């Protein structure tokens, strides 16, 4: 059992820890890949639902790389859904990709889920996703991953 083997089973113990360290649950987010979530059982789904009820974020990563369908979204209590790079690589020129992304964005938003597109590298991709109503964008268009020390030097020090 994934929940028990990872020591995550007692959500309420986690709630006590959060209170002890005096942080807002909204500062915490669990991320699980689409494939892992699809393979997990009811206990894991219930675990994530309890986290969301506590105010903790739950994000599905790499949506579109597995075998789930949009219909599965109604079974999971998510706060964020990350559209996989593979679904938006040619979104600015591929009508099929555009329609798929639009369906994912529309359904997710109808369920109150924030939508993030991963792997955005071109302005045209960003513009198309913005037009479709995507909430957030991630990717090399804005910068490559950097070590914490470099991030601090570039963005936090004046």
Protein language model regions, located:
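Single conserved hydrophobic/aromatic residue that forms the stacking wall/gate
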Residues: 1-12
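Catalytic-core regions built around general acid/base machinery
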Residues: 13-17, 46-54
């Amino acid at each position: 059992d994934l929940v028990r083997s990872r020591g995550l089973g007692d959500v309420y113990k986690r709630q006590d820890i959060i209170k002890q360290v005096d942080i807002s649950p909204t500062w915490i987010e669990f991320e699980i890949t689409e494939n892992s979530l699809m393979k997990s059982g009811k206990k894991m789904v219930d675990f994530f639902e309890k986290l969301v009820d506590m105010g903790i974020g739950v994000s599905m990563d790499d949506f579109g790389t597995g075998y789930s369908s949009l219909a599965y979204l109604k079974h999971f209590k998510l706060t964020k859904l990350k559209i996989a790079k593979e679904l938006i690589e040619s979104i600015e020129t591929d009508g099929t990709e555009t329609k798929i992304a639009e369906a994912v964005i529309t359904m997710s938003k109808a369920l109150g889920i924030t939508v993030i597109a991963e792997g955005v590298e071109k302005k045209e991709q960003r513009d198309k996703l913005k037009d479709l109503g995507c909430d957030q964008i991630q990717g090399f268009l804005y910068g490559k991953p950097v070590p914490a020390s470099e991030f601090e030097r570039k963005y936090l020090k004046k």
